[in-house]
């Protein structure tokens, strides 16, 4: 879609939210300009938007400081959500029983690149 010159990456691991919920937010910012993506995340009411915004700002800082890219020409090239580890916990139930619940974690990988 875009002709990418250089790119910069940022990762955020072990986010305490399920990958399914996190993927809803990352779908909003894929293939957007960085300024538009930040505005989209700023006004989103989802809890995951805070973590995605944090990772996106880290990718922007990496692009500016490490690779010397121009912030005005940056585009979110990839926003990938991966499955993290799962914590298993017990919840006490009636008659001395206990049920197992799973607490899901996610990994987030964001790549921004400079376009012409």
Curated annotation (Swiss-Prot):
Belongs to the universal ribosomal protein uL22 family. This is Large ribosomal subunit protein uL22. This protein binds specifically to 23S rRNA; its binding is stimulated by other ribosomal proteins, e.g. L4, L17, and L20. It is important during the early stages of 50S assembly. It makes multiple contacts with different domains of the 23S rRNA in the assembled 50S subunit and ribosome. Disulfide bonds: none annotated. Keywords: Ribonucleoprotein, Ribosomal protein, RNA-binding, rRNA-binding. Signal peptide: none annotated. The keyword Coiled coil does not apply. SUPFAM superfamilies: Ribosomal protein L22. GO terms for molecular function: rRNA binding; structural constituent of ribosome. PANTHER family: CHLOROPLAST 50S RIBOSOMAL PROTEIN L22-RELATED (PTHR13501), LARGE RIBOSOMAL SUBUNIT PROTEIN UL22M (PTHR13501:SF8). One of its GO terms (biological process) is translation. Part of the 50S ribosomal subunit. HAMAP family: Ribosomal_uL22_B (MF_01331_B).
């Amino acid at each position: 879609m875009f002709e990418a010159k250089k790119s910069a990456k940022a990762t955020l691991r072990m986010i305490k939210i399920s990958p399914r919920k996190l993927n809803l937010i990352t779908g909003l910012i894929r293939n957007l300009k960085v300024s538009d993506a930040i505005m989209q995340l700023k006004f989103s009411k989802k809890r995951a938007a805070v973590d995605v915004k944090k990772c996106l700002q880290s990718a922007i800082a990496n692009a500016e400081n490490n690779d010397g890219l121009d912030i005005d020409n940056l585009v979110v090239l990839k926003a990938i959500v991966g499955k993290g580890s799962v914590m298993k916990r017990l919840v006490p139930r009636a008659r001395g029983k206990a049920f197992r619940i799973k607490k899901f974690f996610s990994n987030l990988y964001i790549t921004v690149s400079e376009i012409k």
